[in-house]
């Protein structure tokens, strides 16, 4: 059945009217027992060809439609130029991309790292291997990409974070303002699993490559700098970039575009 479905999909994509597409799907999560809105941006799909995939995680209060229109407005052009399929799941405004211990309807780590990857590989002509699959996000999505990427090292070969919210312990009152408590409970009982700097050992010997960037005027800059130092101390191979910019669309739109080109360079050398 899968072979027949994939053949049908390939024939549809090869039709001139379906050469390059922005596809909107409702993808069912068995873990959450609900459908998740997801946008898939494809290049010009050709018969008998398989494509790299990058999963893109939006920031707090964002959504895939905003990503296409504002955050990475040239994503369709990049899909065509890089021959890559981009997958944009809806992170539900404030999921923080975790498997919430307090809300069973918010299990986004499993959905994105396992269920969604499996669905995309079954329904699209992908290169179903970690060296052809990446995950990237900014702000809340920067945390999510590192958290999910390191939780599923067998799935993702390259992991990128732009202006990532990397340490909840520094949020203070913003821990509740940004609704982290809705998915992880009170800050006072935050588990070490959700503190990225406590888990850098798991980033060793995974065969993954990591890219982090942050604007020098971003309120998250100090934690990105300290996380970079943690990785250096542990000798975790990564690329760290600082440049002019604040925590806003102007910065991360530019930074994400740069990261996607670095992702392409990674894929081409594997």
PLM regions: where:
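Non-catalytic cap/lid and distal C-terminal segments of serine-dependent acyl enzymes
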Residues: 20-270
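Bacterial Sec-dependent N-terminal signal peptides
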Residues: 1-22
